[in-house]
């Protein structure tokens, strides 16, 4: 109320829950994530373990499996065979895929410059006003930048990986995220693969700076310092040959840029990876999430399983069941297995410690 005229203030503008005219603190009426009066975001102090709805505003929230368990008491649901059919179907609110290109020097070929393709998945409702975690997914041998997103695989039904991300986000089984899919090949017809050193350089020099400059991520800019400061919000994964890149380029060489790691049906010199992450300049960098998995009948099962065990055993920053997880899936070396493992991994990736939610 105005002290001069005695009239009630209409509270036209609030900042941080306080009226800028009369100083009245908003009483808050939180609904679906925001206060209906001052538009302040709900603090989400807790959510129901079954409905996943915030106990204050009613908004459905993804679990945050920090140390393998959400603060609400829920634990992740892992599948070990093909997912329920609904996750492979088109989603009512699909994300979009943007096809981009970038110029890159091939350091192993005298810095020859080539133009490369890059696919970027944006979740439904993507907004420049929000910040998003970023997951780089790398294809396997003979595949390309489309395999993790839009390429169709026949499993008696059309299996398109993008549908899994769309449906998980729609059902609040994972937080909305940006997925970046580059190609390891530097020539036509799946030729001229530059190896993990070249991909590590591309991620550091070009891909991550490009994503940070063109999309709404937690990195304030594409500078190396800003990317390093936001590393907890960047992850890298891959299947088959892509798993070698995820661990070799990502964990072994670019640990200062990535903190979440996903490895399916492959591994890259685990002792060398362990030695690199324990180096003096890397030993204090947290690794909040590491997931690996393979099919029971996959020829890469042994490399995947034992490689995971070696890396976990060689560092005190990884504890199986808390921030390191391995799953065997009923199947072989194919996208049926990888579709299950990406579901298992995405519900846990980018863990955030939250009180009561």
Positions of PLM-derived features:
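Extracellular adhesion/carbohydrate-binding repeat motifs centered on closely spaced tryptophans
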Residues: 1-76
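Non-catalytic cap/lid and distal C-terminal segments of serine-dependent acyl enzymes
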Residues: 77-357
């Amino acid at each position: 109320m105005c002290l001069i005229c005695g009239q009630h203030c209409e509270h036209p503008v609030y900042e941080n829950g306080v009226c800028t005219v009369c100083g009245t603190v908003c009483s808050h009426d939180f609904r679906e994530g925001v206060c209906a009066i001052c538009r302040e975001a709900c603090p989400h102090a807790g959510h129901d373990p079954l409905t996943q709805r915030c106990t204050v505003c009613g908004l459905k929230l993804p679990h945050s499996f920090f140390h393998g368990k959400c603060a609400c008491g829920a634990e992740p649901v892992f599948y070990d065979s093909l997912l329920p059919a609904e996750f492979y179907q088109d989603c009512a609110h699909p994300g979009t895929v943007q096809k981009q290109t970038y110029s890159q020097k091939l350091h192993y070929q005298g810095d020859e410059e080539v133009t490369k393709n890059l696919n970027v998945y944006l979740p439904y409702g993507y907004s420049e006003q929000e910040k998003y975690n970023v997951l780089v997914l790398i294809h396997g041998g003979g595949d390309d930048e489309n395999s993790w997103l839009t390429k169709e695989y026949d499993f008696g039904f059309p299996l398109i990986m993008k549908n899994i991300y769309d449906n998980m986000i729609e059902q609040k089984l994972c937080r909305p995220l940006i997925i970046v899919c580059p190609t390891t090949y530097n020539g036509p017809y799946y030729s001229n693969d530059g190896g993990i050193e070249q991909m590590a350089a591309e991620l550091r020099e070009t891909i991550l700076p490009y994503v940070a400059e063109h999309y709404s991520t937690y990195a304030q800019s594409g500078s190396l310092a800003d990317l390093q400061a936001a590393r907890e919000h960047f992850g890298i994964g891959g299947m088959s040959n892509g798993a070698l890149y995820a661990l070799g380029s990502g964990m072994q060489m670019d640990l200062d840029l990535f903190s979440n790691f996903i490895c399916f049906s492959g591994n890259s010199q685990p002792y060398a990876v362990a030695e690199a992450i324990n180096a003096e300049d890397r030993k204090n960098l947290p690794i909040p999430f590491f997931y690996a998995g393979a099919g029971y009948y996959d020829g890469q099962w042994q490399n995947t399983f034992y490689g995971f065990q070696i890396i976990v055993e060689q560092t005190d920053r990884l504890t199986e069941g808390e921030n390191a997880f391995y799953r065997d899936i009923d199947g072989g070396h194919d996208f049926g297995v990888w579709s299950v493992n990406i579901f298992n991994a995405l519900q846990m990736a980018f863990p955030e410690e939250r009180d009561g939610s």
